[in-house]
Amino acid sequence: MYYFPVSALLIEYLILTIVDSRDSYGYEISQTIKIVADIKESTLYPILKKLEKGGYVTTYSQEFQGRKRKYYSITEAGKEQLVFLNQEWNSYRDTIDGIIEGRIRN
């Protein structure tokens, strides 16, 4: 499968979308994003840290099969950011569709 390049902002949007539906741990998030983007954990974790520092997600640890997993949970600020990013994504997608369909020309 060919993957289109993705930006850090798009990864942030995907992360917030994933943790908005339910709290998730890093590996689970990365595997979901890998459906559409060829990212490495070394790319994902700094973005998760940035979202945490920005107050968009919080973390907690939970034991699973004898090991601790770090879970990410969306905050109210994260929900607000998700609404904003969703609007931006829809606008971007509509513009791309317009170019593809020939409705938008320079």
Please report, for each region that a protein language model flagged, where it lies by residue.
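N-terminal helix-turn-helix DNA-binding core of bacterial DNA-binding proteins
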Residues: 2-43
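Amphipathic alpha-helical dimerization/coiled-coil segments
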Residues: 83-106
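Generic recognition of well-ordered alpha-helical segments
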Residues: 31, 76, 91-94
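Short, hydrophobic-biased segments on the C-terminal half of alpha helices
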Residues: 48-50
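Basic, amphipathic "hinge/linker" alpha-helix immediately C-terminal to the N-terminal HTH DNA-binding motif
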Residues: 64-86
